[in-house]
């Protein structure tokens, strides 16, 4: 299908047969309308299923009727209509009334982002210990591509598939290897994460909270970007 024909087809699916050029389909207008309705229903169903598969924990936690009502509102938004199925779901939490459900939705979306992020070798404490002092101070660090975090609205109510280690109001997601890991961290750790959103020399982190930094390294959230070669 030519690009202009595809665009016209897309407009007809979204807004009805009145937006369909007369030469796009063969047959009578009623037949075209029936065909478009069937296709539109199939697309709508597929988008609902995609949202359910994006948020399986949320779907289990919520009343199904409330989930689908929020899904209907979300999927009807103009900026959402044009998204492909694999990009569907970001921002869904804004259509949820309860804070605990918003936390869960944001966590599930960040889990997907972490899972699909680029590969990288996570920094370890052994890596740092192997560096000479001058090289260590000159080394640059940045976040692992899979690192994600969010501040929970209701930390005490947050629930996942398994017990999450750590304390604090910040949920940290990392993927140093194949598995996405979750743990709770505090505001000091979140401050370090924010600082490492851009490449930073180790010397700029000398004032950081050391236990928090060690926690982040152990979680596989940081990569060694460069080391000065002598």
Predicted features along the sequence, with ranges:
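Short aromatic-glycine motifs in intrinsically disordered, low-complexity regions
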Residues: 134-136
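Long, charge-rich, low-complexity alpha-helical segments
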Residues: 1-132, 178, 183-230
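Low-complexity, glycine/alanine/valine/leucine- and proline-rich hydrophobic stretches
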Residues: 140-198
